[in-house]
Swiss-Prot record:
Substrates-to-products reaction catalysed: L-glutamine + H2O = L-glutamate + NH4(+)
Key words, A-Z: Hydrolase
GO terms, biological process: glutamate biosynthetic process; glutamine catabolic process
GO molecular function, one term: glutaminase activity
Family: Belongs to the glutaminase family.
Keyword Hydrolase: yes
Record lineage: Bacteria, Bacillati, Bacillota, Bacilli, Bacillales
Statement: the UniProt record of this protein carries the keyword Lyase: no
Protein known as: Glutaminase 2
EC number: 3.5.1.2
Gene3D superfamilies referenced in this protein's UniProt entry, alphabetically: 1.10.1500.10, DD-peptidase/beta-lactamase superfamily
Amino acid sequence: MLQQKQSLLEHKPVLSKELEKLVNHYRTLSLNGQCAQYIPALREANQTYLGLYVVHSNGIEIKSGDWQVPFTLQSISKIINFIAACLDRGITYVLDRVDVEPTGDPFNSMVRLEMRKTGKPFNPMINAGAITVASLLSGKSPTEKLESVYSLVEKMLGRRASANEAVFHSEWQTAHRNRSLAYYLKDTGYLESEVDDALHVYFTLCAIEVATKDIAKIGLILANNGYDPLSHQQIFPKEVAKLTKALMLTCGMYNASGTFAAHIGIPAKSGVSGGIMAAVPARGRSDEAMGIGIYGPAIDDFGNSVAGVALLKHLSHMWDLSIF
């Protein structure tokens, strides 16, 4: 199957047409979901959008559908937030304040957090963990903390990222559950900055605007253990990349992560804006690692893109991408 994948890459025009058919086919599944309703600015997206971008270590890029449509990272930013914090403070320091265990609960749930004796967030991929991690970034002010992340993104993408102000303000004004999480974390001693400062950083990261090409590139770097094969630079250490991919596999698709791992088997992270970032490691010398970026704003009850997950499942089976 790996040879088949390479053969497909050698016939890029044919593959592009096949992927266009797949995108158009799975686009119809968007009707089975809806755009995120609890963030007003996200309700306005066209729920029939579906875009795909695939980038390989050898430089081959394949795109299809609405791949150029901009969207905000939302929870995909938790990956970058975690990496930046590990670079700033070290893995040990970060993991002293946030765990690596799946929860099986909704991403914004407080239930298990309150039941846990220590109050330590379960993992960096849920809101409580991500808000905690945002408070760990180096710098005193939100602006200084955000610079750690913006600098990392610039190294990965080769350009300066920016946040969508309308989305940021939309989230800030409706942040009641996240505020309660942050105050609880402050009370238990895990939040290292003031509540409003941590939330400002967190919501700004969620509002960073990207397209499928951008998250595919970040996925490629993760797939190559922090190394960018296109710029030939080690962006972050292998240890950080491996830990991040483990978290993506076990916690990256909200409380559908187990099903996703069993049936698709790729380290991935989703966001309620409809984005999915996947990192496909190489499995031998003759194989090429790849990053996959998908955007489909109609999401299911778990917060994952309906059409995006179905499309990624098809690609995983067609190209034998599962790491298992």
